[in-house]
């Protein structure tokens, strides 16, 4: 939904090369069949994103703490490049908002797989979109046509204009996703799953603290094990990646090793 909310056939978006495998399949194969092109940029150098921008580029996409290499993404650096071109940065923050808050660093939209750490008990399946309310969808109408051209499926509404007028908030992304994509493609959260997620949210900060502690103990053990050649964890990176870990991971270094 996040990509289809800004892209249509003939458009492109730029994604980090550090991605979960299922997301790579979605971007490389499924969206391609819909006429949406994904261009991949190596996040080791944030300027790689800018090099791929053209007049049809609608958004940037990345994961906060991508599996399996756990190289923290340069959120602010790429978000700033995007805003220079009126391009929003969409962040997959499945690593959890307890660990990192991408919107505070300039991301326009955050997506989560709620099944993982927010649910936390293996009992629900779900995802969510979080509109940061910090992106002006009308600043460059040619860059964001889906928010500035009349939507004839909804009485000619121009989402970038009408949503702030009606709500007093800059949440055009969230509203359009709900009234257009959810209307046409489905994927509403089941009530029982919603209830399970509420239970998970109550303990998320406590669970993430323990997850991170457990992971760090596992790292210490594996580093010393004679049969282990390499251990990957955010605290073990060096240089720019290590600096990003300290900058963006304020609630712990994550549960993945």
What are these regions (language model features)?
Residues 1-224, 232:
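Conserved PLP-enzyme active-site core in the AAT-like
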Residues 190-192, 226, 250-254:
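Short gly/pro-enriched beta-turn/loop segments at secondary-structure junctions
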Residues 216, 232-257:
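Conserved glycine-rich beta-strand-loop-beta hairpin in the small C-terminal domain of fold type I
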């Amino acid at each position: 939904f996040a990509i289809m909310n800004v892209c249509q056939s003939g458009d492109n978006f730029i994604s980090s090369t550090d991605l979960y495998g299922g997301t790579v399949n979605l971007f490389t194969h499924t969206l391609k069949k819909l006429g949406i092109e994904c261009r991949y940029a190596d996040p080791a150098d944030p300027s790689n994103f800018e090099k791929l921008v053209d007049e049809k580029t609608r958004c940037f996409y990345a994961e906060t703490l991508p599996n399996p290499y756990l190289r923290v993404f340069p959120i602010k650096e790429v978000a700033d490049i995007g805003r220079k071109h009126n391009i929003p940065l969409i962040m997959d923050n499945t690593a959890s908002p307890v660990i990192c808050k991408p919107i505070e660093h300039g991301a326009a939209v955050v997506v989560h797989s709620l099944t993982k750490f927010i649910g936390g008990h293996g009992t629900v399946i779900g995802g969510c979109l979080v509109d940061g309310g910090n992106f002006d969808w009308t600043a460059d109408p040619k860059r964001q046509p889906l928010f500035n051209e009349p939507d004839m499926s909804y009485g000619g509404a121009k989402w970038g204009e009408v949503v702030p007028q009606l709500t007093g908030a800059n949440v055009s992304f969230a509203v359009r996703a709900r009234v257009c994509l959810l209307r046409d493609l489905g994927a509403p959260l089941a009530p029982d799953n919603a209830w399970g997620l509420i239970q998970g949210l109550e303990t998320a900060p406590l669970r993430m603290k323990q997850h991170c502690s457990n992971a760090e103990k596992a790292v210490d053990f594996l580093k010393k094990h004679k049969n282990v050649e390499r251990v990957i964890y955010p605290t073990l990176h060096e240089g720019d990646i290590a600096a990003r870990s300290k900058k963006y991971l304020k609630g712990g270094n994550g549960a993945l090793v």
